[in-house]
Amino acid sequence: MDLMTQRIFAHRGVSSLKPENTMAAFNEAVNLGLTWIETDVDILGDGTPILIHDTSLDRTTDSSGSYYSLTKSDLANIDAGSWFGPECAGEPIPTLRELVDFMNETGLNANIELKSNEAGAQMSRQLIDRVLSELERLNGPEVILSSFNHLLLKEVRDRNSEVPIGALFVKENLWPDWKSILELLEAQHIHPESDGLTKEMVTKFRSAGYGVNVWTVNTPERASELFTWGVTGIFSDVPHLLLDR
């Protein structure tokens, strides 16, 4: 992966135009000419990796509660589009398998954020194993695995020495030991929060040899500033507004 390339990641797909983390949002990215998306992955009770941000169904579907006891067959009864608008009614929660198929068909690349599974270590390890297994089916598209849970990323690296890793940080936990964390993870990227990020920090990250992909950037002015500083990518809810920055 060329760390010098300036990338715009469609955050949860084009989540300002379509329901987040749905195939409609990912397809919108392709229609707009974007080459990278960001999405979130967690796991159902039967071991199926699904694309969803929250640990409950409440915010982004017509259902409620945890999905940790559900199975793949239950997805047919869950509407992940109506909350966004009536024109999106019936949009399902996608599986990671569906996304991998879509990536192979379109050439779309993805940053996949591993969610910090709340059901315990066993399901967390199962999530990692299932995700890595699905990614073996990729035929061409690039992928980055990221997480705020750096223990999960260490588990990823222990299982796979090659998959690119991006360590996510909120500004409150971006301590001076960031380099030690990245080295222990054998990570290729650091994903810092835009708020509080300075040019000097970006210079340090880049000088250490890491890709710097910043979240979440929704104005052309901030995007241009960050790219001028040398960041390699930005995550945006409105990527279509940044294409002609």
Question: Which residues does each PLM region occupy?
Answer:
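Phosphate-group recognition and catalysis centered on beta-loop-alpha active-site segments
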Residues: 1-245
